Amino acid sequence: MEKIEFAQLQEELYYEKLANGLKVYILPKKGFNKTFCTFTTNYGSVDNTFIPLDGSEFTQVPDGIAHFLEHKLFEKEDGDVFQEFSKQGASANAFTSFTRTAYLFSSTSNVANNLETLINFVQEPYFTEKTVEKEKGIIGQEITMYDDNPDWRLYFGLIDNMYVNHPVKIDIAGTIESISHITKDMLYECYNTFYHPSNMLLFIVGPVDPEEYMAHIKENQEKKDYTNHSKIQRKFASEPEHVNKEKQVLKMNVHTSKCLIGIKGIDVEQSGKEMMKQEWSINLLLDFLFSESSEN
């Protein structure tokens, strides 16, 4: 296990990449009462065209399937995982972004048990055609709800204006029409491709002993049989430099008009830390110019 020290922050981060490829980070915080855990896969709403595990050709899946899969993982044959977390005194949740799907919990007690629950429910999928059809109605209602949210419509309207072909322009949840095509087999195909430990990261922060919890995680993973996983191949449509639409006006029942302005990034060559540095620099500049504390 590697110890990474941040002298300026007086923090010590512990890291290890397990034999199956899972990356584990543990940040011990003395004096904290609550522990937070996230289990994240490098898979989001934009990953709709890829070569499946053991496949040789690209396949395209319906928009919104990553978010749909996130919902379905909480449902098991013997009940809902949320109830198990609740019985163990934990608050659990999950979210899907453009590039990530994360499952998480926070608790002040039974941390080891809750961690076991988190890892196991994510790594033990259970899908049936019946439950998939039922979920379509539930997520359909969620999509309708967001369609009535002015801020949500404003943000995705701006993204749609900027991008011509890239799937980032599509709502993370998809559309009622797109999710109607999702099947049990599609969910398993996406799960088997993107939920391999080598494509995932586990992060723990709280009053925990790194050695103890790393051993606990290793013991859990050693019980499971994961074969080597080849690098995931994704494909995205080429994106022109020009925007899709320069302006769009949407009429909704709001008291105060809202406006967003977007600047499309062209040929961004940075990645990793350099990309993060650029993003933080831009956010700092925008806060300096437009935040509530700005003099402008």
What positions do the PLM features span?
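His/Glu-rich zincin catalytic helix
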Residues: 1-81, 188-295
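Acidic/histidine-enriched segments that form metal/cofactor-coordinating
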Residues: 77-190, 296
